[in-house]
């Protein structure tokens, strides 16, 4: 069964989309490779039936986003769910200064997740504690931000573009492009339109908070569109209405690792859980006559099976 890239609509949870896919495909075996918040839209990758076996190898794929960051107003959830619980006047914004500041956020970083998140600490979900009026001391996590580009500063999120097209540089404003849905604005606040490429585990809501802090004001994520997950671009994503008939792509094509073309003997040894000698280094996908045999880790001397397929 296939791997599918779905264009998640606004105000649906990732689990809502999984449930719809289960009904559309007639199976309970559907999983996703990375949660997308209800107030975000864009690429949500689903694995169906036997493809659920590859979820663990896709959860760490890098992701691209368009983000609308509104300055001068903070919220408990760090997004447009509201209510606004902190405000401050925003000083004049110089785009060159902001672009220079954004470079300091690129590369390996330490990031504190939002209180309203599914992170579990001491047996408690952070969002459950937050909704009950409490807080958890969430430790900072190691993340990577590959690139962070300021497209433009706008006087408000209402004034910022909503229509975009895919370009070689990434998704860019285009009056003839695809229209994106954003949450209802919480007010008229100066807004940064950003294009971001990040590693797994990065919270764009936390990034919005931290960008505001660097500029000396509260901030929140006023809108978010995920435009890419791994090799899946939004331009190739299907709508919920087309889920039932969407062909998707096979497991083998979904795995974005170098390939090893196996002999019959190598395939048999891997399926038996052995550690055959091989010069490959790092994670690889092993195939035999176009069929998936195993995902392996190589150290330059031998292969260790991470998962094998019969």
UniProtKB/Swiss-Prot annotation:
Protein name in the entry: tRNA pseudouridine synthase B
Enzyme class: isomerase
Gene Ontology MF term list: RNA binding; tRNA pseudouridine(55) synthase activity
Name of the encoding gene: truB
SUPFAM superfamilies linked: Pseudouridine synthase
Protein function: Responsible for synthesis of pseudouridine from uracil-55 in the psi GC loop of transfer RNAs.
Family annotation (InterPro entries): PsdUridine_synth_cat_dom_sf, PsdUridine_synth_N, tRNA_psdUridine_synth_TruB, TruB_C
Disulfide bridges in this chain: none
Enzyme Commission no: 5.4.99.25
Domain of life, source organism: Bacteria
Record-level GO BP terms: mRNA pseudouridine synthesis; tRNA pseudouridine synthesis
Active site: 37 (nucleophile)
Record keywords, A-Z: Isomerase, tRNA processing
Similarity comment: Belongs to the pseudouridine synthase TruB family. Type 1 subfamily.
Catalytic activity: uridine(55) in tRNA = pseudouridine(55) in tRNA
């Amino acid at each position: 069964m296939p791997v599918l890239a779905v264009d998640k609509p606004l105000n649906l949870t990732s689990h809502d989309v999984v449930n719809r896919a289960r009904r559309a495909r007639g199976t309970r075996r559907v999983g996703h490779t990375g949660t997308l918040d209800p107030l975000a839209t864009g690429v949500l990758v689903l694995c169906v039936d036997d493809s659920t076996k590859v979820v663990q190898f896709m959860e760490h794929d890098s992701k691209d986003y368009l983000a609308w960051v509104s300055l001068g107003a903070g919220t408990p959830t760090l997004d447009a769910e509201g209510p606004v619980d902190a405000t401050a006047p925003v000083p004049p914004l110089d785009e060159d200064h902001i672009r220079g500041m954004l470079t300091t956020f690129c590369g390996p970083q330490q990031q504190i997740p939002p209180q309203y998140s599914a992170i579990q600490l001491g047996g408690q979900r952070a969002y459950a504690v937050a909704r009950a009026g409490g807080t958890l001391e969430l430790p900072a996590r190691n993340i990577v931000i590959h690139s962070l580009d300021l497209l433009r500063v706008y006087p408000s999120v209402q004034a910022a573009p909503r229509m975009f097209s895919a370009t070689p540089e990434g998704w860019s404003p285009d009056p003839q492009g695809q229209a994106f849905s954003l949450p209802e604005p919480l007010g008229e606040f100066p807004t940064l339109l950003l294009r971001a490429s990040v590693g797994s585990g990065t919270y764009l809501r936390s990034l919005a908070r931290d960008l505001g802090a660097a500029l000396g004001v509260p901030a929140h994520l006023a809108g978010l569109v995920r435009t890419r997950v791994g090799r899946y671009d939004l331009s190739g994503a299907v709508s919920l209405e087309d889920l039932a008939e969407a062909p998707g792509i096979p497991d083998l094509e979904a795995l974005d690792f170098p390939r090893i073309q196996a002999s019959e003997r190598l395939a048999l040894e891997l399926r038996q859980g052995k550690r055959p000698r091989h010069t490959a280094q790092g994670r690889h996908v092993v195939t035999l006559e176009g069929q998936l045999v195993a995902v392996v880790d190589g150290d330059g001397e031998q292969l260790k099976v991470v998962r094998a397929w019969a």
